[in-house]
Amino acid sequence: MLSVKFLVALSWLSAAGQLVLAADIDWESIKNSRGDKLPDFSYCGYRSSDKSLPGSTAASVVVKASSGDRTKEIQAALDSTAASGGGVVELAAGTFRISPGLNISANTRLRGSGVESTTLDVTKLKTAGLPLLSMGNGTNGRIKPSFTSKITDKYVGIGAKTVTVEDGKQFAKGQTVFISRAATEKWVRQNGMADLVRDGEKQTWVPVGNLIQQPRTVQAVSGNKLTLDIPLTDALDQTYMEPYVAAYDLPETNPEIGIEDLSITLSPTCAGRVFNESEPCNAPAIQLNPWTVDSFVRNVNITGFNNCIDVQYNVSRITIENASFFRDRDTDRPGGYPTDINISGTQVLIKDSGQYGRKTAKAFTVITQARAPGPNAVLRHHIQSDLQELYPHQRWAHGFLVENTNANVMFVNRGTAGSGQGWPINAGVAWNVRGGVNVSSPPLGINWAIGSTGPVELVSNGTLVSNGTAVTPKSLYNAQRQKRKGTA
């Protein structure tokens, strides 16, 4: 049973100047019989969307264009700027030939003179997995908890902000924690993922024992009740799991890193090459390394890459804004499709970005990877071809918003695809999507499609609200942010 309050009918003007009729709904009232509510996506982005992206500041170093490979000169400028406390390394107008492996440290920005003026030109990706540009210096070593305490609530729904633990005395305000639970055989089986077989071979979805985590900070402690800074994006059900809170000491983070106002071109192109982990062509143009936080990529054009931006696990509070991805080659088949943006981190905000180039070059324009913790959000994403999809990729990511896009949105069971990618998303929300929508919900989860005006797959068990009619608020992200900041 779904609860939702419809208010009055409203309208707005679309970007094309057309009048869009909309149903005004109370988004806060949307919940199911278990008490699962829409996740709060207002915490996505740089500084949890509490601050604007940094403005234009004077450059610490200006590097001028010239012939030859400029990798060493640019890296030296980045290193000296970081060593002096941070600042902006500005690339003047022109073309800079570089090689993979440039790294940007904390408090340092690499800024061009505009996407039409400054181009980073690379002719070859050298080593499998070595990005052209990387942000931050962290690694994904295992984090050992300093202490843990079992959660005693029978059920904690999506959107909840409090949990009850056995021993609250151990916790304090400001403590960094993982809301954790290990995948159990009972949970895997109840979701229909225990007996996957492909070509006669058993496929494994989420291995039993693998942790599904939600990184949070304790906001308040009252007895054994903990209030968290961000509402949960995945439910906790004692029937199928043994959830607990794990406190940990935050490793050194890499904040305030930026890449902006430039183009990146790989020629000859790698776009669309058959996916192979040992193939250098699958190295990303930009990679945000673990524990990179409060950083951004904006006003960037990327051409010729198979995979463009990779946001790794334990990356958080990131904004990707006005990023354009140009596919200049058709996609090889058979083989996995390339991706524009790959999300394994949390609190990632992608806005006003899109994919261009060959309309026949099929790709996943934004994906989430295995167990990627929410919230993450994609706003106003544009694609030129209905071959492109916003498509959570594998193994129970959770808390993913897609709104106001013309792309196809797929929240569906991927079954034995890959090596058993199965249910890829829980607590996914498609809001005012104009492209095609196919939304299904896992047995122990829920995904929503609200205000869909494009073609909708009706033979599914996804939760559909106001199907065929757009809704107000036009942006769920903006409405939640205004509510949180008291400006609604």
Where are these regions (language model features)?
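Extracellular beta-strand/beta-solenoid scaffold signature
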Residues: L125-K144, A160, T239-D249, V274-L288, ...
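Extracellular "leader-to-stem" segments immediately downstream of a signal peptide or signal-anchor
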Residues: L2-N276, W448-A488
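Short, T/G/N/S-enriched strand-turn elements that build extracellular solenoid repeat scaffolds
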Residues: I74-A82, R97-L110, L120-T123, C308-Y313, ...
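Short, glycine/acidic-rich beta->alpha junctions
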Residues: D69-R70, G94, L102, G157, ...
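Right-handed parallel beta-helix
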Residues: N107, E116, A183-P215, Q219-A220, P255-I350, ...
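Extracellular beta-strand solenoid repeats
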Residues: E90, R97, N103, R111, ...
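Extracellular beta-rich repeat passengers
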Residues: A128, L266, R273-N276, N299, ...
